[in-house]
């Protein structure tokens, strides 16, 4: 039986991406090869407890919610993450995966909504992006940019404009917490008429940076 190292499981309101606002079970896996400057889950880098797939499916069943988000850290850093995602889909859950743009997402079960967080220059990890991931995203997925400054915004805007074909995935622009004002980002998007969604971290407006919320 495959096992995964898990930092925490909890039910909260999904604060980001397409399922924002829904009661959601979060399964936060341990470990991440990246060190983004704005990371708000550094506590997931180390520690954690080993859990079997069956144990995590029991957690999902007992949560009594239909949305499950597998997050990290970087969940794809654990090979058994792919098995977990498929098992959750097979059990009838609406499943999303929060992942960086640094690891291959092509093997993720197509029933999963992949939320790919492409790293900007000021994240400190922009050189780790696997840009080939953009070519496998579908309308079921989301591409997220967490923006630390006007320069980050312009980088993301130009990357999108330079593509020969528009991305089928939804594109989300999110202000880095405490670094870019949401109102400023909204003004930039409107001024450029960008076909992107403004995203704020709803859970932080509700509960701040409290772990497990």
Which stretches of residues belong to each language-model region?
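Flexible, acidic/Gly-rich N-terminal and inter-domain linker regions that tether
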Residues: 1-30, 34-38, 190-199, 204-208
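Conserved AdoMet/S-adenosylmethionine-binding subsite of the radical SAM
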Residues: 77-213
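Short amphipathic alpha-helical segments, especially helix-boundary/capping motifs
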Residues: 1, 32-34, 59-62, 131-135, ...
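Conserved Radical SAM active-site core
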Residues: 4-11, 23-26, 34-113
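Homeobox/homeodomain signature
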Residues: 3, 17, 22, 58, ...
């Amino acid at each position: 039986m495959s096992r995964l190292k898990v930092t925490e499981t909890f039910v909260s309101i999904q604060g980001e991406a397409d399922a924002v606002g829904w009661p959601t079970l979060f399964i936060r896996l341990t470990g991440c090869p990246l060190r983004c400057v704005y990371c708000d889950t550094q506590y997931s880098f180390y520690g954690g407890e080993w859990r079997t797939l069956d144990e995590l499916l029991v957690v999902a069943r007992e949560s009594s919610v239909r949305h499950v988000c597998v997050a990290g850290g970087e969940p794809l850093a654990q090979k058994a993450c792919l098995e977990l995602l498929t098992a959750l889909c097979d059990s009838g859950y609406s499943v999303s995966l929060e992942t960086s743009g640094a690891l291959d997402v092509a093997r993720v079960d197509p029933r999963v909504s992949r939320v790919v967080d492409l790293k900007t220059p000021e994240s400190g990890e922009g050189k780790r992006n696997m840009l080939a991931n953009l070519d496998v995203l579908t309308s079921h997925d989301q591409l997220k940019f967490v923006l630390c400054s006007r320069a980050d915004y312009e980088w993301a805007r130009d990357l999108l404009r330079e593509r020969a074909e528009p991305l089928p995935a939804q594109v989300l622009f999110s202000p880095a917490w405490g670094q870019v004002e949401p109102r400023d980002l909204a003004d930039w998007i409107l001024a450029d008429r960008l076909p992107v969604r403004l995203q704020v971290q709803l859970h932080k407006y509700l509960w701040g940076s409290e772990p497990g919320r």
